[in-house]
């Protein structure tokens, strides 16, 4: 609480000009307690030279011109967009044209990837429908299923 009070006091004092601060101190020393009137309170205007503490920093003209110059090159502009998209793993290549080509390849592959289906919960499992022939099951399940089924059938014939 004390830190918050000190920070508020510092901001209040830093925004006062020296003459306003001197008048405030003299009023406090004289012990004049005036009634507060919101309409009579004059808020001192901030001069152009002072910058509000919480306001934005002034823009640097050279920085702005550098940004415009960087976007004048279409390869640099596209590369900055790809870096924002996360396709910036091509720093070992020197040419920005080559970097751009690989970034396009990466994004094309990413856009053509199969859409992953969410994992099904147990209540979303499909129920088994009807009796299917062994050939259909073997074709669906693959070679290992066919081999194990054949092996069981062969052993059943020997026992019988």
Curated annotation (Swiss-Prot):
Coarse class of the protein's main subcellular location: secreted
Keywords per UniProt: Glycoprotein, Host cytoplasm, Host nucleus, Secreted, Signal, Virulence
Location(s), subcellular: Secreted; Host nucleus; Host cytoplasm
GO annotation, cellular component aspect: extracellular region; host cell cytoplasm; host cell nucleus
Lineage: superkingdom: Eukaryota
Family according to the record: Belongs to the RxLR effector family.
Name of the protein described by the UniProt record: Secreted RxLR effector protein 83
Encoding gene (name): RXLR83
Signal peptide location: 1-21
Its job: Secreted effector that completely suppresses the host cell death induced by cell death-inducing proteins.
Presence of keyword Ubl conjugation: no
The record's note on its domains: Has the canonical translocation RxLR motif, but lacks the canonical EER motif, which characterizes most oomycete effectors identified so far.
Residues that carry a glycan: 39, 131
Position of sequence motif RxLR: 27-30
